[in-house]
A protein has these predicted regions:
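Short, low-complexity Ser/Thr-rich regulatory SLiMs
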Residues: 9, 102, 137-141
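Amphipathic, hydrophobic N-terminal targeting peptides for secretion and organelle import
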Residues: 1-24
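Short beta-strand edge/turn micro-motifs at domain boundaries
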Residues: 109, 125, 130-153
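Surface-exposed, charged secondary-structure patches
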Residues: 88-119
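A mature extracytoplasmic/lumenal domain signature
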Residues: 77, 112-116, 150-151
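Aliphatic-rich helix starts adjacent to a transmembrane/signal segment
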Residues: 25-29
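Core segments of small alpha/beta cavity-forming domains
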Residues: 30-86, 90
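A short, acidic/glycine-rich surface segment
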Residues: 44-45, 118-123
């Protein structure tokens, strides 16, 4: 009888341990997915602009941004929008690849490859440009925001 009780305790402990690890792995995967999706969306928002609704496009970038990147982009938004309108620029970014470079606590660095189609008054049809971006993302509450953007050579 005592052996059965010990066996049941061991089985319960093992089930609890496996359950905890499964839960932790699921949470880690969700965080990974959140960081990756935010990095991808940040790249699309930054590379997709249209002079006809550039103010809404700029707001999309601001909505997914935080920290120093948000402040810097907000300061430059009016001048940027004016240039986009003046040149009648249209850009459309398409993600070709994306992956997590590193994760540390509530932040991650995401590498994103983007093909960007561009047209404007001076050059109506241009070949797509291929950009590689390094996007820093931070979890704030239940969402993640872009905190820094750089280009990879």
């Amino acid at each position: 009888m005592a052996a059965v009780a010990v066996l049941l305790v061991l089985i319960g402990a093992m089930a609890g341990w496996l359950g905890w690890h499964t839960f932790r792995d699921t949470q880690t995967q969700r965080l990974h997915d959140l960081f990756l999706q935010t990095g991808r969306q940040g790249a699309v928002n930054l590379t997709t602009m249209n002079f006809e609704h550039v103010d809404a496009d700029i707001q999309r970038v601001l909505d997914i941004s935080a920290g120093a990147f948000y402040e810097d982009f907000q300061k430059r938004a009016r001048a940027f929008g004016d240039v986009v309108k003046k040149t009648q620029s249209m850009t459309e970014g398409t993600i070709t690849e994306a992956g997590i470079e590193s994760i540390s606590g509530d932040s991650a660095r995401v590498l994103v490859a983007v093909a960007v189609k561009t047209s404007n008054l001076a050059a109506p049809q241009q070949l797509p440009r291929l950009w590689r971006m390094r996007i820093d993302v931070q979890k704030i509450g239940q969402i993640a925001k872009v905190t820094n953007v750089g280009f990879v050579a």
